[in-house]
Regions:
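Non-catalytic, mobile gating and regulatory segments of ester bond hydrolases
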Residues: 1-112, 116-235
Length: 235
């Protein structure tokens, strides 16, 4: 249930706040909806009487800062420089809002995001270890091997079959994943597979994509709609 719930949120954060979006968040159980848009970086903070959810928006092709962030594959304080810069745009506002909500009533804080938003969500959790769980979808590597070991928040890293984004930046540039991999296989099911099993499953996915005329299978599998479709079938 949590995988699907946070996936729906991670998809919704690509929309700016309006009445319809507020209704969609309400349908997911949230009575408080806050939207932040700072220098091309966006986040939502959602709350109800039982929980707070912090969600970060992923890459938007129209946002030059998003593209530059993705390409800035150097390190700053153990983090991917581009992703860290996007997080820092939102850092003060998001942390202040979470503190304000917690000041009214203490609730568990969940964090989520897709693509670039997943990377920002990860960095947020390094700075907010009180979060109870981090759910990411198509998350790129965002920390050095040493820094990745320092994450205290339970991280459920969902990867859809041949999604290309979790493969970058390359590990040989000293970038690592963290958290527990939750792999969506060729059949659309969440499974824990060995490396060899994932390789075989990856080829099944490519073959299916070619049969459908989908040349860029890794790009299609990265779409948040593809994640939501698979997780809907898992319910």
């Amino acid at each position: 249930m949590e995988y699907k719930h946070h996936a729906l949120i991670a998809r919704l954060v690509y929309k700016d706040l309006d009445k319809e979006v507020k209704k969609e968040f309400k349908a997911l159980g949230y009575t408080t909806v806050k939207f932040f848009d700072i220098e091309g970086a966006q986040a939502y903070i959602l709350a109800n009487k039982d929980r707070i959810t912090v969600a970060f928006r992923g890459t938007e092709p129209k946002e030059k800062s998003d593209i530059f962030a993705d390409l800035e594959a150097t390190h700053t304080n153990g983090f991917h420089t581009g992703f860290l810069e996007e997080y820092e745009k939102l850092q003060l506002s998001v942390h202040e809002e979470v503190a304000k909500l917690q000041g009214r009533k203490q609730r568990p804080v969940y964090v989520t995001g897709h693509s670039l938003g997943a990377a920002i969500a990860s960095i947020f959790c390094f700075h907010y270890p009180e979060a109870v769980a981090l759910y990411t979808y198509g998350c790129p590597r965002n920390a050095s091997w040493k820094k990745a070991k320092e994450l205290k928040v339970p991280h459920y890293r969902v990867v859809n079959n041949n999604d290309i984004v979790p493969k970058v930046p390359p590990a040989f540039f000293n970038f690592a994943h963290h958290g527990q991999l939750r792999y969506i296989n060729y059949y659309g099911n969440i499974r824990e597979l060995t490396t060899w099993q994932r390789i075989k499953d990856s080829w099944r996915g490519r073959r299916r994509a070619w049969q459908k005329g989908q040349v860029f299978d890794g790009v299609y599998d990265h779409l948040m709609d593809a994640y939501c479709e698979c997780l809907e079938d898992n319910e």
